[in-house]
Every structure is written in C-alpha cells, then in structure tokens.
Amino acid sequence: MIFRQLFDHVSSSYSYLIASRTGGEALIIDPVLDKVERYLKLLEELDLKLVKAIDTHVNADHITGLGALRDRTRCTTVMGRESQTDVVSIRVSDGDTIEIEGVCLRALHTPGHTDDSYCYRMNGRVFTGDTLLIRGTGRTDFQNGDSQAAYDSLFNKLLTLPDETLVYPGHDYKGDTVSTIGEERRHNPRLQVSSAEDYADLMDKLNLSNPKMMDVAVPANLKIGLSQDAVEARGWSLTCAQARDSLGQPDIVLIDLRDKAERAAHGEIPGSVHAPYPELEENVKPGGLLNEIATATGKRLVFYCAFGERSAMAVQAAQEAGLEKSCHIKGGIDAWKKIGGDLEGGEAKNS
C-alpha cells in the first residue's frame, strides 16, 4: 500500500494520495490547486497513474486541484450527489463505493459542515474532510451548514465506527496528523455534549470569521467542470434527442465509459460497448479496441458517461488519435434519463 498525507501550509489542508502498489492506479482526496505540480511529480516518481480525484465537499479555504488534475492526467473527478459543482465525472451517494486497482473506499454522506460533505472509509481508516477534525469539528455557519445535521453525522455515523479506526482529517491547525475514533470520542471537546440541541448551541456561539479565501474559492470550486460547449462547437457532440434518433443505425457504435458499478446501478443504453474510461488511452491507440472498431468498420464512435465530462475528454482523445468520426452524448446518462431514453440492465427501471 502506498499512502501519502500531503500538507498545504497556506490553507492548513491535508490531501491524501493512495495506491495499492508502485506502478499501479492511484487516487487523491482533496487536492489543492497550488500543489498540483507536487502531486504530478510524486505520481511520476512512484510510477503511478492517477485515475480518480475526490473532493469531500466544496471547499471554502482553497481552490481545488480537481480541474487541473483532470486536464493534466485525464483522471475521473468524484464528488457527492448533493454538490452544486457544475460538472464532475462521478457523483456518489451514501454507501457507494469508489474503486481503483487494489483500493476500495466507501462513501459516507455526512452533511452538517456543508450539505454536500462526504467522508470516505477505507479498511481501518476514515477520511473525514471537514466533518471531524482532530480535537475539533467543522463549522456549520455557511454553505448550507446545519449543526443538527452535523450532530447526526458525527454521533450516528462516524462515532459508530470501531474505536481503533484511524481518522485522517481535511485540515489541521495545530500540527496533528492522525487520530482515532476512540480518541476523538473521549477527548474532542466538541463531542462532549449530551444532545443535538447542546451541540447546536455550542456551534452557534463560535462566532468565527469567514475563511479568507471563501469569496474566491467557493465560486472557483463550483466551476471546475470541463466545458462541453467547446466540444459541441467543434461538431463533436450529439444532444440526447439526436442520439436517441440514431439508435439502431448501422453506422454508429455506442461506447459506455462508466465503471461497472455505475452501469449496474443506472443501466446502459441498449447496444453499447463497454470500454471503461481508465483504459481510454490504450483503446484509442492503433491496435486498441476502439481504434480497431473504428478503422475496421468505419463506424462513428459515440461516447457517453454519467454527466458528459468523461465523454467530452474521450472524444478529444479519440480525435487526437485520428478517429475523426467520434463524438459524444452531451450531458450523459443523466440527461438521457431526463428525456426518457431507453435503458436496460441494473436498476435503470427504478431510477
């Protein structure tokens, strides 16, 4: 296991780089924009391929590195379904899993600090974002914060984990790096309350000033998505209606870029070929699956994903590889469902 806790002194933020082995796939949690070059160097030194970048919530004290890492590595971006960020590749709900080679995280929706806050559990560790800090908890007085929701997240989710679970927070201001659930239950001053009302009263009396970066960071972090308009302007997009009208035509092939778990949960467009996004670079090269399909049949590759971000990047990669007939479905499965497009498999009929 490769595990690196990386600190940004300006915002007192922790980021976490995780992989199962040297030379394998990696993910990063809560990357900071100003540290992207550091992350890229570390990835190169460890011979890692970044495949997923996760934000635990929309941060107010630093600008996220999600967009820059996506642009530099073509990684998949991940946030909670409640996030108001314009475009991310995968939106998780409580209980969902995020997987890469040899690593599995389970998403825990923990609203309170913000309404889109998530923690991620991995074996004996939990990455708590700003929900639970070492001897502290996240403030609840902005970004749809709610002290009673925070109490529920803390006492009915995080504090139900085994005492020995290691706690890795999104921030620290005193030089601490790790704690445990048991330590925080016993020694965290904000957890020494007897009711949600007591916790709300404690939090309401903090009278904290807003983070210095808040007016810059929050708007920036809501706009990290890859613009699909630029892809559309080059004639590389189909609307969902156009894609639906083209179903069954002999000159196209639909390419589903999503993970197996996404397909199982949300279904797939009938007749799709599954070519997972992390394998894209190999698949569009000469000899790769998608290159072979396109060159052997002359068919147009029509990419789709969950929200259109991965497919927009995929069509750019395919065009760069000389697959000039390729395009993508703007808005992905999310938009496809909204127009009543056909889906098969998984839980599609119930979603």
Predicted regions, residues:
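Active-site neighborhood of phospho(di)ester-bond hydrolases with catalytic His/Asp-centered motifs
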Residues: 28-31, 51-59, 78-82, 110-112, ...
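Divalent metal-coordination and catalytic microenvironments
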Residues: 18, 30, 57, 69, ...
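Core dinuclear metal-dependent hydrolase active-site scaffold
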Residues: 5, 17, 97-122, 160
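Accessory terminal helices/loops
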Residues: 152-166, 170-241
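Catalytic cysteine-centered active loop of the rhodanese-like fold, especially the PTP/DSP P-loop
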Residues: 108, 275, 286-338
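Positively charged, proline/Ser/Thr-rich regional signature most characteristic
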Residues: 230-301, 346
